[in-house]
């Protein structure tokens, strides 16, 4: 039985195993607090994310379950990796991942980025997205603060808690609006991997300019700003709008022509502008895919088709449409024990999954 130690961080109780010491707050999100810590077993710094009250509602239970399954499934150099999971006696859940020193948002607000860093960061973002998309996963909330970077400029995409959620209420968040694809704003329902390419394009443009490309005050203003640069959406895109109110709004906007991006990004490499043109396309079907973007001339210094892997298998989304009570979502506890046992099997050559899972399920029965 693990020994738990309590600490107060920003008025929040962190109840973690004694394996992790030297807690320091590094970030606070809508669904949890993140601290840095020292792993006494490995001697390495780690990030410990507390999911507060994960079983308080069915929605939050499902969200936590989704993030856990995704972190277990997605194994890639440009995706944050999960090293430990535990549930405290207070029934809070803690995810332990590798610790990276900063994120892209902090970098962008501290200094302009040189060309080689912009290239390398974009390459790694797209390399990660190629893998994620091949697994049948849409991140959906890609933004600079979800892109972690260490002192060696290694980059990892994090925060998959919102992946593949189709929830219009989430679209009101100011922090994510700037990077949101137009098809999400226009239809609020059907979208696919192309939304992440749009977000990556907005991040790319921000790296080039040092400021957000589409800093809308609200969704109406956001869409107007987009059309000022990219012109009025094509008729076939407008025809996909499902909301009558949105359709009336779009048709009421003045007709605008697409502006050459070279006129806005005057100091950028022509190859950078060309790639951005291919990423910032209204019609998602015509937007460049991650694998195609990796092969673009702008990323030639880093592109290596033999080292840009795809997922071995698709992610199992069968649970995602389930509308279950909190007690049923507590099956995630068995997943946590399963994760530990798989790691132990890799180290010690033995698996004790079945008994541990049974014990975990009984504990929450």
UniProtKB/Swiss-Prot annotation:
Disulphide bonds in the chain: none
UniProt xrefs under CDD domains: STKc_Sty1_Hog1 (cd07856)
Alphabetized UniProt keyword annotations: Activator, ATP-binding, Cytoplasm, Kinase, Nucleotide-binding, Nucleus, Phosphoprotein, Serine/threonine-protein kinase, Transcription, Transcription regulation, Transferase
Short sequence motif TXY: positions: 171-173
SMART domains associated with the record: S_TKc (SM00220)
Binding-site positions, ATP: 26-34, 49
Record-listed E.C. numbers: 2.7.11.24
Gene3D superfamilies: Phosphorylase Kinase, domain 1 (3.30.200.20), Transferase(Phosphotransferase) domain 1 (1.10.510.10)
Modification after translation, per record: Dually phosphorylated on Thr-171 and Tyr-173, which activates the enzyme.
Biological role stated in the UniProt entry: Proline-directed serine/threonine-protein kinase involved in a signal transduction pathway that is activated by changes in the osmolarity of the extracellular environment. Controls osmotic regulation of transcription of target genes.
Name of the protein this chain belongs to: Mitogen-activated protein kinase hog1
Species per Swiss-Prot/TrEMBL record: Aspergillus niger (strain ATCC MYA-4892 / CBS 513.88 / FGSC A1513)
